[in-house]
Amino acid sequence: MPNIKITDRLSNGETLLLDGGTGSELQRRGANVLKGAINKKDATSQQKTWAWSATTNIEFSDVVRQVHKDYLRVGADIIISNNFWTIPSRMNSIGLGDRWEEYATAAGENAVSARDEENPEAYVAGGIAAPTMQSLQEVPVPDIEYMGEKAFHKEYYDHAKLLADIGVDLILAEYLGFVSDSVAAVDACAEVGLPVFLGIRHIGQNGKMQYHNANQNNTTEETLNELAKALEGHPVDAILLMCSNPEAISAGLPIIRDSFNGPIGAYPNIGYNPTGPITNSPTLTNQLPSGGKDILQTQNYSPSRLAEFATKWKKTGAQIIGGCCATGPEHIMAMKPIVKD
């Protein structure tokens, strides 16, 4: 366990290196991250990710731990546990709802043990992704509206408490797309007594959030300014823009910097299709530790190109920089000199 609290390092002005994608890296290394992902009601319909990568925490635990270690070896200060969708609602979707705690515990323990073995001074962020059950609706609505306040709170609190008991250093409530969900998730996670970081997904290149607010037929996108205002007085220790393309993050960071009084960060998606096949990319054959296997489209954002974005983000004020879907250890290694300079 680290001797210095992560919040103290951020308060002192340090910039920390976050890890890269976990689920996509697991898939690239041959782990089955799509167990239960096909919509069984209609096998010809578009695949859904359901509990994407959750089952790997037990079935491919050695690969999960190795991915964590590889990120630490290239310099990551923070790794995110592979708890992305080990939450009850998502595990229910593949018939494993009664075992969610088993898979969630395995994910947390995999990350903590990898950290303890590789670099005890690194931080483990207990990652909890938004249920996004509203994505099943014709008109998306916030999870808290779809699930109800009580069920939403329990989903987050129970997961955060489990991870805190395992020994993670902070909670990362990530993949949030609505303001109301973001505020409620932060409040629930903070009850376990750890720092809480917030990850906002799929922002547009106009710097706005993913969804329109469907209430009252309001078709105005929620904004990052509105998010920051709504979070005033709530226990959020950092806001990160995530799972968005680098250009969108570049547009959004100045907005969140100017409206939020706290550390900000970025971890972009660089083109990964979670239900797509693994392909061989000769472009990256010599760069990938897996020997050339590449998830779709990453050749558009080489490690060196992503490092150029990291330079901009650091100048903008980002203190936590890493990667999301399709980024791998090679991307994090390329960003290290910029982030840690």
PLM regions: where:
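Domain-level signal for soluble alpha/beta catalytic cores
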Residues: 1-341
